[in-house]
Amino acid sequence: MHPRGKNVRIIDQKYNQGTAAARNVMVANATGEYLFIMDSDDVISPDCIDILYQKMKQYSVDFIAGSFQRQTWDGDIYPGGYRYKDTLIKDGDYAVAEYRYGQGHEIFVATWNKLYKVQFLRNNNIRCIDGYMIDDVWFTYQVIMCARSCCLVSDCTLFYTYNPNSVTSVRYSQKLSEQYVGTLSLKSEWIHGLRNKSFYNGLMYDILKMSVYHSYCIGNSEFVSPVDKQKLLSNLLSRKFPYPSHWYFNKFLFKALPFLLFYSFPMSIKIWVIRFIVSINLKDKVKRWFHF
C-alpha cells in the first residue's frame, strides 16, 4: 500500500512483462481523464504536470507534448533532447499526420513526456505491442495517425537520463531486429487506405528511409546470423504498401523517389548494395543522414 493510497494506485503484474505490457495496463486501468507516461530513470520538472494540464484545459486536444533535455546519471546536461516551438494543431481528421508527414515537422517518437486524453487512446484502440522492447515507435505512430488535434509546448518538462546500456543505445540483437521489421510492416499495413492523401508521400518516405536504415544496422550487426540477416533484409527491402492513387509533387515525393528506384531493383542487388555499404563502413554517414 502506498502512503498516499487515495491518490496513488500500484498495479502489480506479478512478474516483469516489459514496458509495452505495463503501458497497455495503464491505458486499460486509468481512472482519470488524462494519462502521463515517464520512464523510472527520468526526471520531470516540478511544474511538468501543471504546465501540460493547463494547456490541456485551455485547448482540449488529443494530446500535449512537452520539450525535453537529455542528462547523464550524474545530472549533467548531455547533448540532444528536443525543444518544440509552441504550436497548436487543431484541424480535424489527420491534422497531426498532415503536420508530421505532410509538412515534415518533428513530433518526438517517445511515448513519455506527453499528456494524453485517456478516452482518445481507448476510442482508437492505441496500444503497444506486447513483448516489444521498442514499444514507443508503434504507439506514437498510432497517436499521430489518429489524433485530430495536439499542442506542442516549448517548456522543458522532462530530463531524459542517457543510459549507454539502454535498449535504444545497444547494437541490434536478433530480437530487436525482428521488432524493428515488425513495426515497419505494421506501418505499411496502416497506410494502405491513405493512398489519396496529400501526405502519403511523407508516409512512404518515412517507411522507406527507416527500412534502409534498419537494413544497414542489421547488416552491420555481429549479433544476427548470416541466415537471419538474409531473411530480415529481404523483408525490409520488400515494398509492402501501394503506390499513391495520385502523385502529389511535393518535397517528400522527391525525397522518396531515390528509395522507390532502389526498391525497384531485384532483391539480390538490393541486399548486395546494403552489404557493400556495410563493408566500406559508411556507418557515420548513415547516422548523419537518418535520425530517429
Over which residues does each language-model region extend?
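Donor-binding/catalytic cores of nucleotide-activated saccharide
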Residues: 40-151, 161-174
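Membrane-interface aromatic/basic loop that binds lipid-linked glycans or pyrophosphate carriers
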Residues: 221-292
